[in-house]
Amino acid sequence: MTNDERILSWNETPSKPRYTPPPGAIDAHCHVFGPMAQFPFSPKAKYLPRDAGPDMLFALRDHLGFARNVIVQASCHGTDNAATLDAIARAQGKARGIAVVDPAIDEAELAALHEGGMRGIRFNFLKRLVDDAPKDKFLEVAGRLPAGWHVVIYFEADILEELRPFMDAIPVPIVIDHMGRPDVRQGPDGADMKAFRRLLDSREDIWFKATCPDRLDPAGPPWDDFARSVAPLVADYADRVIWGTDWPHPNMQDAIPDDGLVVDMIPRIAPTPELQHKMLVTNPMRLYWSEEM
């Protein structure tokens, strides 16, 4: 399959945001795809995207006004983290990463990932993206992570309560992708947001990403339901929120977002300079570049 025959899920000419991020701002949730000729996709991949390599990611970073990236291993690459490690290496200190690993990984392999810039592992519970999510094996590997690492968990709101005992048992900090995908049409006091707040209140070391208006708000831009539902959460948990573009927007080929508009959501969910600095600089620095704090 040629590159042009694969899925295009990102805007190739994103607008320039009206909002200017603060100096040192971090895009703390993005991915790279391939290039496939160098980094083949997993045989188990549920989608086959076009190449979206580090040069494209870093050009977007600069275009949007960010200083650093946290690159999350994309599910299409399975547990082979080579593409993500390559992108981190090319960033010359301006990127860190989140790996996806076989739970049987040994300590030497984890140490090598740490040396390569990884600072956590991701557990994915979206059945359309992964075939197996063994909680017992996930807990075992979570107990062997290098010092300072955390676990990123991706799930949808309808299984939050089912996952609570599993998350309670994780022995390291947790970061929740996309707030556990709440139905933002319910508003800030809806059942999904209330359940997510209960989760955040259960542990002081659970963080979240206030991300993906394009995924969570089916009405489309300007994503008013997302802004209305998420702004109170950011205000109430300002020390535990981070943000990212989600570029190159896996599986969003039917509703490709404009990254400039995605960035312009920031002041709507974090309306003060103080909140913006926490979400974009202080908090992700604590998680990913703590040695510089």
Curated annotation (Swiss-Prot):
UniProt note: phenotype after gene disruption: Cells lacking this gene show a complete loss of PDC hydrolase activity and a growth defect on vanillic acid. Growth on syringic acid is not affected.
Active site: 246
Catalytic temperature dependence: Optimum temperature is 50 degrees Celsius.
Pathways per UniProt: Secondary metabolite metabolism; lignin degradation
Gene3D superfamilies listed in its UniProt record: Metal-dependent hydrolases
Binding site for substrate: 29-31, 47, 75, 122, 128, 154, 178, 251
Stretch list, region Disordered: 1-20
Catalysis performed (reactions): 2-oxo-2H-pyran-4,6-dicarboxylate + H2O = (1E)-4-oxobut-1-ene-1,2,4-tricarboxylate + H(+)
Pfam families assigned: Amidohydro_2 (PF04909)
pH dependence: Optimum pH for hydrolysis of PDC is 8.5 and optimum pH for synthesis of PDC is between 6.0 to 7.5.
EC number: 3.1.1.57
Regulation affecting activity: Strongly inhibited by 1 mM Zn(2+) ions. Also inhibited by pyridine-2,4-dicarboxylic acid, 5-hydroxyisophthalic acid and 5,5'-dithiobis(2-nitrobenzoic acid) (Ellman reagent).
Class in the EC hierarchy, top level: hydrolase
InterPro entries, per the entry: Amidohydro-rel, Aro_Compnd_Degr_Hydrolases, Metal_Hydrolase
SUBUNIT field: Monomer.
Protein name: 2-pyrone-4,6-dicarboxylate hydrolase
